[in-house]
Amino acid sequence: MGLSDGEWQLVLNVWGKVEGDIGGHGQEVLIRLFKGHPETLEKFDKFKHLKAEDEMRASEDLKKHGTTVLTALGGILKKKGQHAAELAPLAQSHATKHKIPVKYLEFISEAIIQVLQSKHPADFGADTQGAMSKALELFRNDIAAKYKELGFQG
């Protein structure tokens, strides 16, 4: 399940492009998540009133949260799988406070892939997409294992 050094390099290269506009990418990821899986919106008290895409695009809070999400994910990706210290508090909050099911992490992973395909087609070919998919799957599997340790059946 682990990624090769070359795969990690592909992931981090495209992630550098994300960091060039992390707020824009984060906003787009959350909009795709909420439009594709409206049930996920119910987990966000701050955003559940946003029903239309233009309302979502106008929300500074949504953009700010997208930045938070992708900044945290970027920190985890940069650890190249050695992310236990970064993952523990994230799993704790998402299991005990936010109660985010692993399925929703799959949904946001799909949204991340879609946004990267849309914004960076020249830099997100099959090899890079495959590497990113593996990295996100590793992240989800490790979160799921932490959830289990915490007794959360997410």
From Swiss-Prot:
Keyword Flavoprotein: no
GO biological process, one term: removal of superoxide radicals
Residues annotated to bind nitrite: H65
One GO MF term: peroxidase activity
Coiled coil regions, renumbered to chain: none
Xref: InterPro entries: Globin, Globin-like_sf, Myoglobin
Keyword Heme: yes
Assembly description: Monomer.
The protein's name in its UniProt record: Myoglobin
Source organism of this protein record: Hystrix cristata (North African crested porcupine)
